[in-house]
């Protein structure tokens, strides 16, 4: 399990069009469950096998709100606020509920 010693998660991926709804849902879920900004970068275009990659690059805040989104090749910008993370981690303290353990 991840620890909470980070403020942003970055995922670089190649999710094809038939599965893009899962990509969108997972990015939002990762932001919420980790109380961290989630930055997802997905490829665009068509590969050599004819599979379409529709982008859906996005940034989500700690509450799962989508800040920016693109379904094409472009540069996205988002401002991330450390205070927003701190306030929400203080308000929703579930990250402190995790147990530390080792599997052997």
Please report, for each region that a protein language model flagged, where it lies by residue.
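C-terminal beta-strand edge segments of enzyme domains
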Residues: 43-104
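Active-site beta-loop-alpha substructure in enzyme catalytic cores
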Residues: 1-34, 38-40
């Amino acid at each position: 399990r991840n620890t909470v010693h980070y403020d942003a998660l970055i995922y670089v991926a190649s999710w094809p069009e038939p599965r893009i709804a899962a990509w969108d849902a997972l990015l939002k879920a990762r932001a919420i469950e980790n109380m961290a900004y989630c930055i997802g970068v997905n490829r665009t275009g068509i590969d050599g096998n004819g599979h379409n990659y529709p982008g859906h690059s996005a940034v989500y805040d700690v509450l799962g709100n989508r800040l920016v989104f693109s379904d094409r090749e472009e540069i996205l910008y988002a401002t991330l606020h450390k205070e927003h993370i701190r306030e929400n981690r203080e308000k929703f303290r579930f990250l402190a509920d995790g147990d530390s353990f080792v599997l052997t």
